[in-house]
Amino acid sequence: MAHKKGTGSTRNGRDSNAKRLGVKRYGGELVHPGHILVRQRGTKFHPGVNVRIGGDDTLYSVVTGIVTFERYGKWRQKVSVYPAEVAAQ
């Protein structure tokens, strides 16, 4: 007598929905206050100038300006938003 189910066991077939993480606004793009820059789990990207971090580690802009990705120490990256009139100079 078999004690294991054969092929096509009902124990298979579950998966979670994709969370749509990643960079949403790239370097050089114009953003406005509240625009989401990066959706992430943990701090792969750290908040820089004029960028805040949400409760789920989402980075978002607090001013209108241009997005820049910058090195932050040896291993880290930060995302900053510089005001458009300052970035134009």
From Swiss-Prot:
Region annotated Disordered, chain positions: 1-24
InterPro entries hit by this protein: Ribosomal_bL27, Ribosomal_bL27_CS
Gene Ontology MF annotations: structural constituent of ribosome
Annotated Gene Ontology cellular component terms: cytosolic large ribosomal subunit
Gene Ontology BP, a term: translation
Keyword S-adenosyl-L-methionine: no
Keywords from the UniProt entry: Ribonucleoprotein, Ribosomal protein
Short name of one Pfam family: Ribosomal_L27
Family as reported in the entry's similarity comment: Belongs to the bacterial ribosomal protein bL27 family.
UniProt protein name: Large ribosomal subunit protein bL27
Gene this chain is encoded by: rpmA
